[in-house]
Every structure is written in structure tokens, then in C-alpha cells.
């Protein structure tokens, strides 16, 4: 298959999902949180990381749903496992503060480290900040987890 044809096929497959995501975003921006939630939830059920992160954000701030840090963490985790950088950053923040998940600096450092490796300067700063609350053994454990994730992603 030529590169042009492969790109066209990828666009044809991604097109409807992208349109649905944009429809949900438009609904969200207009304050129609119910429609946004329904659209993103349908996409998230299909494994769309952007939609999973969007649902997490709705639960994080309580936009159209009850604020629920636990549900936010669940949705962020699903997106983060797919490599979504913002989800990784936000999941790391939840672990560092213990909101919705037990406080766990190793997990926080790992998720922030993965986001930092994707170019997030904020995640890199936050990782450095929480490292002051960690032992050297915890930092080494978190670094090992980061390497394991990066190896799996290759």
C-alpha cells in the first residue's frame, strides 16, 4: 500500500471518530454537558484515549457530572495507558495529592516522568518537586517503572 493510500485509509477510519469528538467538544463548550458526556462516553467505550481524558476532566471538575476524583483517575488511567500525555500528567498529579487514589509518590513520579518524556515541562517540574518527598529507593523504583513502560511502548 502506498503512503498516500495508507494515509487516506487512516483518515477515512479516523474521520467519524474525530467528527464525534469535535461534536462533543462543541457541545461541552456550549455548556451542553449531557451531550458531551454521551458522545465522549461512546468513544471512550471504543478505547479513544482523547475521549477518555475528556471524561476524566469532566469528573475532575464536576462539569455536568458529580465531581469524583476516583472516576477521574479511572478515566485518566485508561488514557494514560494508551500514551496520552495530558492524562499521564493529571494521573500523576492525582497520585501526588491522594485525590481519588491513595497517595503514592512512586506512581506519581512514574506517570509524571512518562508525561515529561513526551515533552511536558510542567510534568518534569512536578516530578522534581515530589522527588523531595521520596527516598532514593522509591525514585529508583519509579525510574525502573518508567523504563519498563517505555520498553513496552517500543
Located regions from the model:
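TPR/TPR-like alpha-solenoid signature
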Residues: 21, 53, 74, 89, ...
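Hydrophobic face of amphipathic alpha-helices that form TPR/SEL1-like repeat modules
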Residues: 20-27, 39-43, 54-61, 90-97, ...
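Sec-dependent signal peptide recognition
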Residues: 2-10
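Terminal, low-structured helical/coil segments at or just beyond the last alpha-helical repeat
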Residues: 122-154
Amino acid at each position: 500500500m502506498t503512503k498516500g493510500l495508507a494515509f487516506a485509509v487512516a483518515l477515512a477510519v479516523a474521520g467519524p471518530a474525530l467528527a464525534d469528538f469535535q461534536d462533543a467538544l462543541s457541545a461541552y463548550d456550549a455548556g451542553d454537558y449531557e451531550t458531551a458526556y454521551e458522545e465522549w462516553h461512546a468513544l471512550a467505550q471504543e478505547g479513544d484515549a482523547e475521549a477518555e481524558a475528556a471524561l476524566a476532566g469532566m469528573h475532575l471538575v464536576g462539569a455536568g457530572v458529580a465531581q469524583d476524583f476516583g472516576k477521574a483517575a479511572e478515566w485518566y488511567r485508561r488514557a494514560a495507558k494508551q500514551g496520552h500525555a495530558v492524562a499521564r500528567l493529571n494521573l500523576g498529579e492525582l497520585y501526588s495529592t491522594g485525590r481519588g487514589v491513595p497517595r503514592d509518590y512512586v506512581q506519581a513520579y512514574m506517570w509524571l516522568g512518562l508525561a515529561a518524556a513526551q515533552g511536558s515541562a510542567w510534568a518534569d517540574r512536578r516530578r522534581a518537586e515530589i522527588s523531595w518527598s521520596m527516598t532514593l529507593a522509591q525514585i529508583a523504583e519509579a525510574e525502573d517503572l518508567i523504563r519498563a513502560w517505555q520498553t513496552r511502548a517500543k
